[in-house]
Each structure stands twice: as C-alpha cells, then as structure tokens.
Amino acid sequence: MSELEKVTAVDTTYDASEIQVLEGLEAVRKRPGMYIGSTSSSGLHHLVYEIVDNAIDEALAGYCTDITVTINDGDTITVTDNGRGIPVDIQPQTGRPALEVVYTVLHAGGKFGGGGYKVSGGLHGVGASVVNALSEWLVVQVHKNGQIYEMRFSRGHITQEMRVIGTTDHTGTTVTFKPDPEMFDTLVYDYEVLHTRMREQAFLNAGLRITIADKRPGQEQGEAMCYEGGIREFVTYINRNKTPLHEDVVYLAGTKGDSTAEVAIQYNDSYNETLVSFANDIHTPEGGMHETGFKAALTRVLNAYGIKYGMIKEGDKISGEDAREGITAVISVKLTEAQFEGQTKAKLGNAYIRTLVDGIVSDQLAVYLEEHPVVARSILDKALTANRAREAARKARESIRRKTALGGAAMPDKLRDCNENNPELTEIYIVEGDSAGGSATQGRDSRFQAILPLWGKMLNVEKARADKVYGNDKLQPVITALGAGIGEDFDPLKLRYHKVIIMADADVDGAHIRTLLLTFFFRFMRPLIEEGYVYSAVPPLYKLSRGKQQRVAYSDEERDAISAEMRGGNPNVKIDISRYKGLGEMNPHELWETTMDPEKRTLRRITLDDAVHADATFTMLMGEKVEPRKEFIERKAQYAVNLDY
C-alpha cells in the first residue's frame, strides 16, 4: 500500500485508552432505521458494511492488509481481518474490557477523539455495537498479545464474558453474527450486493486484499480482489464496456496536512458523464466539496489549454457540462473530521477539501495535457463538439420548459389523464401500443389512473446526444406528461404522478421497451428512479379455465400450483391453460383485475442501489459494443425463461 493510500495512526499503540464512550445502546433495537437506514434487505447488508468498515479503518491506519467476508450456511456472516485486534485491556472510563465496551456501548470506538484513527469511515462510528444489538447472536475473537480472546453476545447482551481460548502467532479480529429475525424483513444475503461493495472498497484502498466467499450449499462462489492500481483500475473497470478516447488513465494526487486526495480520469466516446466520489471510502452520491473543486478545476484547465493553443476563442469558453461529456472520473479523499450532510453521508461538506482537490487538478492536469498533446486534443475536440450541440439542446430544453409551464394545455394528445390533481395520489401507466392502451383506458379507475400509450420505434438514448433526446417525438409525450422537465432541469417536486408504471408485454419486445424507458429515465431523469417513483407492472402469464372457473398465474410455479388446486386431486380433470401473448389480448376487465387494481396487482419498484453498476449495465445492454452484450447473454442464458412461444 503506497504512502498516499495510508493515513498513519496518531501513534502505533492501540489499547483501551483509545476507546471513548459517548452514549448507551438502548435505542438501537427500538429504532434500527436511525442507525442502519432500514430493516429491509438494504439494512441487512449494512450490518456487514459496518464490520468491514472497522477493518478498513485498520487498513487506512496502515495496520491491515487482508480482509475476508464469508456468507456461511444459514446466512450468518464472518468477517476476518489481520489488523492489530480490538483492544482487550481495561477501558479507563468504564473499568470494563475495551472489547466489551466496543460491542455494547454506542459510539464507543477508536475513531472518536483523534487518538486511535486519523481517518475513519462507518456510519457515524456506530459500527460494532449496532450490529451486536441487531443480531440474534454474535461471536467476536481477537488475536492479540499472543492469545486468542473470545466474547459472545445475544441481541446486545453478554452471554459469555471475555475469556482466553488459545494462543496465536498473529493479530487480527474475527466477527461472526446472525441477524435477528425479529428485526429484519429478510435474512437472506445477496452475494452480488456484497461482492460489488467489497470490490469497490478494494479499488479505493490500493494494495488491500479483500476476499469474499459464499459457502452456502449450491451457491458456492468467491473472489479475492486486490488492485495495486487503486482508483486507476476502478476507472478502467467502469469503462470496460465503453470505447476510451485515450489509453492512459490520468492519475492526479496530493496531500495537505492529514488530508489526501486522488483523482483518476479517462474519457470515452459516449455522451454520458460518470463521476463517482468518495470520502473516507464512503460513497457520496450527492457530491460535495470534493466534486465542486474537481469540476471547477477541470473546466478551467481545459479552457486555458484550448485558448493557449487556439482551439477556443476567449469569448466562447466551454461549459462544465461540455468539459465532462464522456468523462469517467473517480475522486477519493481521505480526511480527518469529515463533515457529511445528513445521516446517510450523501454529501461532503468540508470546504477546505474543495481547495485541495481544485489545486491538485489545476496543477497536475495542466502539466499532463502539456506532456500529452494528442490526448489533450482528443479531449478538447470532444468538449467542443459537445459545446456546439449544447446550444441545440438548450433550445430543445427551452421548448420543453415552455410546454411544461403551460400545464394541461400542453399535454400529449394520446394521454388519457386522471381527474385527481394531487400527485401523491395519482399514477400513470406508460403502455406499449395503442391496443393495450385502449384496454387500459377502458379498464382503469379514471379518478387517479392516467394512461399514456407509446407507439413506433423508441430512441435508444445510450447512443444519442442530448439534443437528439430532447427533440425526439417518441420521448416528448413522456417528458411532457410527467411535467418535471429533463436533464439538469428535472425537478421531482413538479412531477404530476408519484407512481410512473411501465406496463409492457411479457415477451422480448416488451422487455426491450422496458429497457429503453429505464435507460432514458436513468440518463435524463435519474432522481425519478433514485426517489422511488418508477415501477414495472407485472401482467399475468397464463389463464387457467375449468368450466366457468377461471384463474390467472404470474409464473410457471404458480401455474402448476393453481392447476393442481383446480383439479382437486383428480388428475383426469381437464384444465385449459392458455398463455397471454400480450396486454392487448386482455379485455379491460381482465386488465383491471390482474394488473391495475391496487388491491390485487403486483408492482415492482425500480431501485438504484449502485449507480456505478447500473451505469455499466445500461452501457453494456444498450451501448455500441456487441461483445460485452454477447458475453452477458451467454452467462445469463441458463436463468432465462422462454419469453416468446
């Protein structure tokens, strides 16, 4: 691990005097959402992140090189690191072993007061004690001082006092826990979710080896990840399905006092900006001062270079938007006393980090461009092309703005609006085809359900510049009906419906339309997905009939179960089973009963847990490169169902 990636501890001792106690643990089980966000699958996975964050704190301090995360049979989790081991001596404030304090007292840890760690992540340092409080049981073993210490807990209470169970020739901590079924909606861990997070952490900490293993029977898999190139390799990974404009990943880094900043940049031939930022290894999706400093410096440096070499006239400078078209950049800062806005740490507030990042990018990127004129020209050419297209896009956006301002008068001809005006109570079905749109219009509850049929070939926005998207006649009705604008003008507060439901056939064509719409929402109306307004309707696949009795099934398994139920134990009873080819085959009553009635329907909310992964997936599915798409199809073919027959 290079010196840049390390932030050395204040001193090399790590004992009980570094553990500070701030408050008790009583509230965690009463209000778990305050500490881990939710008790859904997201919160379940957050337990793992909290323990891993503690191990990464040791890595940031320069004392840990290996972390292993294991999903055990029964969905218990084991996290092992080779750091110094949690202190086991007596903690001065409490007179109890520090290990006990760390796992039973909220806000007890070496990350407070500046004594144990200069740099630390975690959710406000609640870490180990919150995981303990929300676990049915937890066992922690510490290898330290040549001995193995062990403690056991249940729902935050001690079930076995700290004791020595053996000797050891190494140091580190191993934690195994089982989430409490009383606290969580699900106890099943998703390997891909954990794998993605661990890979991200390995990229952010150059040279740190993170291994993930799934030991559940029938699901065995795993990977050891170690990236000596750090965030440079992260950028290469993000761009793997894109065509880079230049081979090198530009790497810029610097230190001021106890703070470090590093930036990795590579442009590609797409029209999308992918900017991913972190503070103390915590993703900051809403940006903050580090992003502000980067953006300002990037635009300033490109303009200065362009003016110096006659590519840009003094009065025609490129904008920040132009400068970032096609960029993939990762920004990672490590700092003491990080100030995050909000409990979710979505935005970094430390003002001095802006100056640090701005200075690094200003100085080092200017030198890089001078030394690599071919790369500089390719970046400037792309920015200038974006600049020329921006004016056309601006005019198209202005047109949309004017239409949106007119409200109902500007609504699309094919929109069948609802009577209710309160967006919190309304929903819009975006439906494939006029025939399905007709059935949906007749079958809906017009008090709160609006219908917008789509027809013709829809634009693949992954391959189109913004001005083409803004002016597209197939997307205009969607933009206008939703009423919240597009691109940088998009404002969720202006949404006319708080449920945007994509209703398409359960076949290949329907899947394609869903993907095209989701790509559009992701690239040009991302808050729509981020704030949970987008849904996918789930129409039935089968109709089963026995005389006058009729049932519908939404999967092959449900079809078989209903068929057996309708036979009533008599295998000779004939059940007529027909597969719905499309939404247009259903009459209005059937469509209402199966797909639109809020009391009976199934809706799938589209969520965005990992923007980097989503970005790569949309590029792979809808971008120019065929080979990654082919590999994806071949890899996933075993899980596919027969969509067309």
Task: Describe every region a protein language model picked out.
Residues 17-30:
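Mature N-terminal segment immediately following signal peptide/propeptide cleavage
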Residues 1-15, 25, 49, 57-59, ...:
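GHKL-family ATPase ATP-binding module
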Residues 92, 341-354, 552-558, 562, ...:
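Helical (often loop-to-helix) elements that flank the catalytic cores of nucleotide-handling enzymes
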